[in-house]
Amino acid sequence: ASQSSAHGYQPTGGTPELRQAMAHFYKRWYDVDVNPDTEVLPLIGSKEGILHITLALCNPGDKVLVPNPGYPTYTSLSKILGQQIVNYDLSEDNGWQPDFDALEQMDLEGVKLMWTNYPNMPTGGRAMRETYERLVAFAKRHNIVIVNDNPYSFILSEERLSILQVPGAKECC
């Protein structure tokens, strides 16, 4: 209590030490280099991140691809912010992975953002490297930003996968 440096609010972007620790974590567990100064932002929870990303990348009227089933916050925040929700279906028949043939047939004009969620909630479907590779290629082909929400990856899978392991992913994720 007697040290003035122990009081006050943390920097909005988190302390450099925390961001550096997060970058080391990503390197250790996913073998992905992230710049702690420009590519790491500590958050108080997923909803804050979903809001920040949507506000930064989408305007009212823009379209957002949302998995069905998926985390309800993707839909609710986009609706509040005036975006159009375009659902893409996930099916147990293909392991809860996106149906890329169906996605390619959709009207993608005006789509700015695509939410993915692996391990998938609520289904528990696990990520596959091939899915991440196809998502990156899809995003580049259609100029869409992919945001992969990666919850529970240490609980539901022993394989450590990140979409950022795919070459070129940082260009569209």
Language model regions located:
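Active-site PLP attachment segment
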Residues: 159, 166-173
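A short helix->loop->beta-strand "cap" motif at the edges of active sites that frequently abuts
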Residues: 62, 83, 141-145, 169-171
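A short helix-loop-beta submotif of the ANL/AMP-binding
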Residues: 80-86
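Active-site phosphate-binding strand-loop segment of PLP-dependent enzymes
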Residues: 86, 90-161
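Conserved PLP-anchoring active-site segment centered on the Schiff-base-forming lysine
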Residues: 56-78
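Short acidic capping loops at alpha-helix termini that bridge into adjacent secondary structure
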Residues: 34-40, 60-63, 110, 170-173
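N-terminal small-domain helix-loop-helix segment of the aminotransferase-like
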Residues: 1-45, 52
